[in-house]
Amino acid sequence: MLANAIGSMASILNQFLGYAGFYLLNAAFEGASALANMLLAEPIVTESQASREKHPLRALPEQFRQLMRDSLHVLRTCPMAVKLIASSALISVPSYLTKMFLQQRLVELGWPTELLFLPLLLGGLACVAGTEIGRRVRCRSMRRLYTACALLCGVGTLLVGTAPAWGGILGMMLVQGVLEVYLLHESQKLNDAIPSDQRATLISVDGMAYSLLMIPASPLVGAVGDAFGQAGAGLALLGGVIVLSGVALLRKKPQES
């Protein structure tokens, strides 16, 4: 997160590197990352993992089907995992959209494009701060934590969509920081709720749920902004939805602590 924040400052080097330079530099970093990933190995946690054999390519389709059956079984028998996955997907929708549409709003408000790295830098620093705060937060109830984080994320999204330039930047920082607090505890609870053998797959499902929500959310937010002639209009609507999701939990009787 800190590297991404600092990397956002690379926009000021645009006049020296150009698009080709940035792509080549990115390719070099990705290549180094791929080499590092090749050194990773799965830790052996359970006996079934220790006795696992390598399968030929022709067996992969059946292995995939079995993996899907096992994952669906875990989701059916663990409602908590489903709730956690759904909550993280919904509350994470503003994460990318606030950063992207804030840049459009800043340009509309007269900001020079050379300074658009600044909100991305501050957003990355807010993520770092949110992670540090999150590990100090004692979560006794995911329901209450979601309610608090949804209200704060919703307010932050509303600020990005409606406030002046610095108010929008502060709103985006609020969204990024609060999300790190919630997602830190959500991932811990999800890890505890699912078996080790299905953990990697279901964590991927966690990310996939967010991607599926972004498919309609991103064009919808943009379409609302185009309809009203303001980039922030769609964000204001999105912020209201996130706030309502938190308010809705306030009216529900707690079922878990």
Label the predicted regions.
Residues 19, 23-29, 33-56, 250-257:
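Helix-loop junctions on the cytosolic side of multi-pass membrane transporters
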Residues 1-15, 23-38, 42, 87-104, ...:
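Substrate-agnostic recognition of the 12-TM MFS/MFS-like secondary transporter fold
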Residues 159-172:
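Helix-loop junctions at membrane interfaces in 12-TM secondary transporters
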Residues 43-86:
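Juxtamembrane intracellular "pre-TM" segments in multi-pass secondary transporters
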Residues 27, 144-159, 239:
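Structural signature of the two symmetry-related core transmembrane helices
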Residues 80-85, 146, 168-169:
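Hydrophobic alpha-helix/TM-entry signal in multi-pass membrane transporters
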Residues 21-26, 116, 145, 202, ...:
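Alpha-helical transmembrane segments of multi-pass secondary-active solute transporters
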Residues 111-120:
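Juxtamembrane helix-start elements in MFS-like secondary transporters
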